[in-house]
Amino acid sequence: MGDPAGIGPEVIAKALAGREVQRLCLPLVIGSVPVMERTIKALRLKLTVVPVHGHDPVSLKGNMVAVLDPMETPLKKFKPGVAAADTGGASVEFIKKAVHLAEIGCIDGIVTAPINKEAINMAGCHYPGHTELLADLTNAKESGMMIVGGPLRIMFVTTHVAIKDLSKLLTQAKIEKAIRLAHQALTGLYGIKKPRIGVAALNPHAGEHGLFGNEEARVILPAARASQARGILASDPQPADKIGRAHV
């Protein structure tokens, strides 16, 4: 569900009101039953919430929506759109439950609704976002964030950091890792035999040979060349205003 005070419940309700999701899978909402009921009522959707307990098989008909609430105590009253420890903590519990169900084979995949990073930190969960939390919960040796839109798939070298800190955080090893994970995802998850990976520059005009910064020559180009040597079809650093058109 994401943060109950956020847009997650609304997005989920509207998605489940259509037929596309049901054609793809048997959806299970992990979140607050009362929040889903209030959201559906406010949106005037023809959906009925069916509370689910434990790991029992779910049988749904028509416009039924299965909701599993892992919270031991009901959520206190909260204000929509306002960060709070209670809702932040709840969103973390929802994620933990989803990961557990996936690990024991009860569900095949997880789709996350937005969390509020301020709220989860207020609740004592000091993660900058979903990616880092999921990696920790699954004891992943490596992880990365890839966003997908149409034919474009973007893998990040850094996540959830201030722009002023980017230069000092970029290393050749981190860039090589991102390129390698992108290649693994494209070949393994998407079945693309020989994916082309455009490596983005950091500075305007790819640094213009050091005129606008040296990160390209110092770490990005060496990482790209090392990846090329391993057989990955990675480009040399490309300016941001060019890379999308060139590699779609």
Annotate each language-model stretch with its function.
Residues 61, 142, 150-153, 193:
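A generic structural signal for well-ordered coil/turn residues at beta-strand boundaries
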Residues 147-177:
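Ligand-binding beta-strand-loop-alpha-helix segment within the catalytic cores
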Residues 135-149:
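FAD-binding core/adjacent interface of flavoenzyme oxidoreductases
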